């Protein structure tokens, strides 16, 4: 039985739809279950539901053989996992945003973000020295209360930025969800994992063909 770590929330719904597209017999009530660990004996799968940032931890430490994680999490965490497949679901991107016509402090302006490693790397590559302030939620609030001049955050539709009077300043990197694998699990259960990769690849291509039509 393969243990699959899945992120709760929007990605979970899209991932389940992709698994069904790949031919997996997923119970219809799985998406609405309150359980955090769910077995699907007919497919020899066990699902662990976790916060997005925790999925890579479960896979890295081997309590999950495989998992689904956003590219943003993989870039931020830099964990020892194999990134096997771009699932092409939950597309979004990381961006720098702030209030329009904001005066940026000339010496180490402050940037609030849930992604301190990504933000630090980005501004360093831009040759800009900044002070990174790590937040765990409501990053958009930081410029409004004077905590930071800019933020680095995930943008999907841009609606949250607009509703809070913020504008996108720079686009950093595109993000989609990825299929990740524990290195030891890959050696021990390579056939089962490769079969899952093949089925998901087929589903991704099928979805792509439908989108083109």
Swiss-Prot record:
An individual GO BP term: L-histidine biosynthetic process
Which EC class heads this enzyme's classification? transferase
What is a single cellular component term in the Gene Ontology annotation? cytoplasm
UniProt subcellular location: Cytoplasm
What GO molecular function annotations does the UniProt record carry, in alphabetical order? ATP binding; ATP phosphoribosyltransferase activity
Pathway(s) annotated for this protein in UniProt: Amino-acid biosynthesis; L-histidine biosynthesis; L-histidine from 5-phospho-alpha-D-ribose 1-diphosphate: step 1/9
Q: What is known of its domains?
A: Lacks the C-terminal regulatory region which is replaced by HisZ.
The protein's assembly and partners:
Heteromultimer composed of HisG and HisZ subunits.
This chain's protein is named ATP phosphoribosyltransferase
Q: Which gene encodes it?
A: hisG
